[in-house]
């Protein structure tokens, strides 16, 4: 029994969900998202409630029941409110700059690291040490934020690097001399 899969999704007033074959489409004020769902999972829309049920009880279908419900819930939240990930640059001389459609990071390498803008995502640099990635797809926002973080992930000795806002970096003690 999937506890997440059995929960219903309550739709905001300005969001509509439709299904055509195996493709679920969610439309809202911020845009439109589509995703294919497994044929063993059945989606039912009643008024402003969306519920999911599964045809069989095999392990793969049980695993996808809650996942499908969570994905559609994220789509509903994305088209109504959107998602934002904030990254902080920690380190002497580390900075980010946005020029046109290009994000440039100076994070201690001999060369700057560039990222081009992506469809459906917006990247803002409110100040030189903060990067905000926002969009309607939780997966795409998280993927781009993870790519940016991977350029210089936080190291455990001094804590320098790119980290998510609110992320706690576990610190290590350095070597002790003789």
From Swiss-Prot:
Family: Belongs to the universal ribosomal protein uL6 family.
GO cellular component: cytosolic large ribosomal subunit
Keyword Iron (UniProt): no
Gene assigned in the entry: rplF
Subunit architecture: Part of the 50S ribosomal subunit.
GO biological process, one term: cytoplasmic translation
Protein name: Large ribosomal subunit protein uL6
InterPro entries per record: Ribosomal_uL6-like, Ribosomal_uL6-like_a/b-dom_sf, Ribosomal_uL6_a/b-dom, Ribosomal_uL6_bac-type, Ribosomal_uL6_CS
UniProt entry tagged with the keyword Hydrolase: no
NCBIfam families reported in the protein's UniProt record: L6_bact
Keywords noted in UniProt: Ribonucleoprotein, Ribosomal protein, RNA-binding, rRNA-binding
């Amino acid at each position: 029994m999937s506890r997440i899969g059995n929960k219903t999704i309550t739709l905001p007033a300005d969001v509509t969900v439709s299904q055509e074959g195996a493709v679920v489409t969610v439309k809202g004020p911020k845009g439109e998202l589509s995703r294919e769902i497994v044929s063993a999972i059945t989606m039912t829309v009643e008024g402003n409630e969306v519920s999911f049920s599964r045809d069989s009880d095999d392990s793969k279908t049980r695993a996808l029941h809650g996942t499908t419900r969570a994905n559609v819930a994220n789509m509903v939240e994305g088209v109504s409110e959107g998602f934002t990930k904030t990254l902080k640059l920690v380190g002497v001389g580390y900075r980010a700059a946005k020029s046109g459609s290009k994000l440039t990071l100076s994070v201690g390498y001999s060369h700057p690291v560039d990222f081009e803008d992506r469809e459906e995502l917006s990247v803002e640099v409110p100040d030189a040490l903060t990067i905000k990635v926002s969009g309607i797809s939780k997966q795409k926002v998280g993927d781009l934020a993870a790519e940016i973080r991977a350029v210089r992930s936080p190291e455990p000795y001094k804590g320098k690097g790119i980290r998510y806002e609110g992320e706690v970096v576990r610190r290590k003690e350095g070597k002790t001399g003789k």
